[in-house]
Structures are given as C-alpha cells and as structure tokens.
C-alpha cells in the first residue's frame, strides 16, 4: 500500500489536488482520506503532470490540510447493490444515512459502467402498463423507455411518482430505485415516510430494525451536498438499478431532478478549469448526459424504465440543460396547473403529453384509434372554449354541444383515485387494467354514456364504477 499513498497539495472548494511519489491512479479512481474523523472519497478527474492528479470531493472539504495522506483504492467508487439496499437510504458512496447501520449488499459494484452493447440490447417495443388511465391511454410508457416528467411545484409530481412505484411494485412485483439529485432534504424525508405509510417500504421500527420486504431503494445527494456528490449520485442510483436489471427484474428508476445533475456538473467543470460553453454550462454537457442515459436501457435480461423530473430554467425549453435531456426521452408526461385547479388528479395534460409508442404498430389499432378520438374531442372542446366564454353554451350547434358534454366527461374520467393518496382523500385507490381503460373511453367517444351526468365520471376507476355512481346520483336526485 505504501506506493499507493499520496498527499494533498492544494484544496480549492470541492476540487483537491493530490501528489503521488511514483504510482499514479487512473482517471475515475476513488481515493480515500479522513476529514474530521469521517471517510472522505475523492474521485480522480484530471492528470496534471509531475505525478499530480486533480480530484473532485464527494463530501465537504472543510478541514482538509496540505500534506495530508491520501490512499488510492485502485478502482472507481464501489457501492453495495442487491436486495439489502431496498428500503434503505444511501449517499453517493454507498454509506447508509438512515441510522440503521451499514448497508451490507450481496456485492459491490463500480458506479462507472459501460453501456450495454448492441448485441445485449432488446429491440422490442413493449408497453409498460401503469394502471393510470391517462398515462396508459394517451402517453403510454414503454418498457425500458425514458419518461420526462414536466411539472411545477404542487401539481402532484411526487404523488404521481409514488403511485408509479406502488403500481409497478404491485402489478409487476418489480423493484424501484429513487435517486434524489440536488433534492430538498425535507422532500426526501417526506418521500421516505410516505413510502412506509403507503406500504411500498417496510417500517424498520416495526420489523426489528430490518427493511426486508421493501420495494424501493433510495439514493440521496441533497441540495446542501458539494457538487461532486450531486454530479455522481444519479450514477450511484443507476448502478443499484442496473444490478436488479441484470438479475432479470423490470426496474423503475426515478431521478429528481435531472437538471440538478447537469447543474452540479457545471459547477465542477468551472473548478476543473474547463472553458465553459453556451450559457456557462460545461463543454462536456452532452457527453455527461449521454453517459448516464445510454446506461438506462432494456437488455435481453431485464429492463430499466426511467422517470425523470425535469426543471426548465426560466421556462426556456431551448436552454442547453433540458435540451440535452430531450434528445433521450421516449415519452413526456406534462403536469398542468390549469388541470390541477379543476380538481382533476393526476393533473396530466392530455394534449401536451406525448409518447413514441403511441402507434398502431405497437399498441394496436383499437387503442390507437380510441386515443386519437379522445384527443380530437378534447382539442375541439379547447377550441370552443373561447366561444363558450363570450357567447355561452346556448350559441353552440347541437353537434358542438354534444362534443362539449363528451369532452367534459372524458376530462373527469381521466381522473382517478390513487392508492398513495388514500390517507388524504379517504377514497380507496384504483388500478385500472388497460382493456378496461380502452373499453371505457371507446364507449365515451361513441356516445354510449351520453345519458350519464358528468359527476358520475369523476374520481372513479373503470366505466362500470361510473355507471354505478350515475345510478346512485339519479337515486339521490329522485
């Protein structure tokens, strides 16, 4: 080990220079030292010559001194993987931060991996049924696809993410990994407790300190962490997800927020002395994003489906950060404040959300035709809203009145009670089968349910429930 040790020569914020006597660690190797009694990991980013390497610190560098000894571990950052990570919270270097003792995984795996080769990748376009009507019908997710979740504050992003984890866990028996990149610590804490309350994860305090039986692993690098940790925590989460995929699982991988992954990369880039590119971002923006996104893919063994929350700076979609992630997305789920204001949850915008697999070749003729008819009806209603606002409903033709009535029913039928929101709403959550979703909306656009009041369609699961609710409303009115 003697020849593998070096010493710190310079500390500038999150960037630390280390000089070695003879041995020089490779780029991306993890170096270890101690700082105020804690293990500090440094990742090699550049070779400067004269046996000196420039590294990025994965934790605070306050307290480091020049001349301090540093050891080369001989490989990249290694994190525990496997079922031991489920129900636990880890940081970027795989240390537990939930005060339940260390995470002892089946194995350790390097956070930097090659993307699967062409021969390993699966080329089938297969739909991943989520049990959420609006998503399954109008912007279906594909197994192994990448979904961008666009939404402001308070429109239900976290609840939608929670419900997806819950539904996939129930319907597919699959595992989920949540990477909080530049997360608010409070939100991360809320998510952990919400998962226990909604039975996605097991409460260790009621299970002899064990989280066995949980369905979701959490990897956090919060806002207060140095940029090194925020730039790598998405890779740590992905490494945990890749292990489950290689075991033959269908994994759901959440990143909140992909913009902060880019932002952290930009902070580090400036400290490393790279010349910034457009809008001050790192020159390696597309490479960094590609290295992460190309690993999120379906292989012949299993699939990773990723849902990524994307913050758009100043609502400018042409900003280099969101633009770099757009190139990789297969589907976009847009959450709209105007829909949330109507009390329709999930507040997914049915006209703005898109999907690559909304094609008759993948989802079949019937599903495709019903989805297009639903969108046409909603689009027509949107076009008529100005006329209604100025002249009122009475000025519309009979045909347009019928379109408006159907569109309002469709709007309400796109709402659905969530399992994870049961504690707040008091109404039991619904998981709707794809065939039931198509059948319900097909009947709506064909006019089979024109006789039912629009309230009957609000916050129900299948069309049968809407008919039942309609009968109840009629009985109450009588």
Swiss-Prot record:
Which enzyme class, named as a word?
Answer: translocase
What catalytic activity is recorded? ATP + H2O + 4 H(+)(in) = ADP + phosphate + 5 H(+)(out)
Classification via Gene3D superfamilies = 2.40.10.170, Bovine Mitochondrial F1-atpase, Atp Synthase Beta Chain, Chain D, domain 3, P-loop containing nucleotide triphosphate hydrolases
Q: Which UniProt keywords apply?
A: ATP synthesis, ATP-binding, Cell inner membrane, Cell membrane, CF(1), Hydrogen ion transport, Ion transport, Membrane, Nucleotide-binding, Translocase, Transport
List the record's Gene Ontology CC terms alphabetically: plasma membrane; proton-transporting ATP synthase complex
Name the membrane topology term: Peripheral membrane protein
List positions binding ATP: 151-158
Q: Does the UniProt entry include the keyword Cell inner membrane?
A: yes
PROSITE patterns per record: ATPASE_ALPHA_BETA
Q: Which Pfam families match?
A: ATP-synt_ab, ATP-synt_ab_N, ATP-synt_VA_C
Known function:
Produces ATP from ADP in the presence of a proton gradient across the membrane. The catalytic sites are hosted primarily by the beta subunits.
Q: What is this protein called?
A: ATP synthase subunit beta
UniProt organism field: Azorhizobium caulinodans (strain ATCC 43989 / DSM 5975 / JCM 20966 / LMG 6465 / NBRC 14845 / NCIMB 13405 / ORS 571)
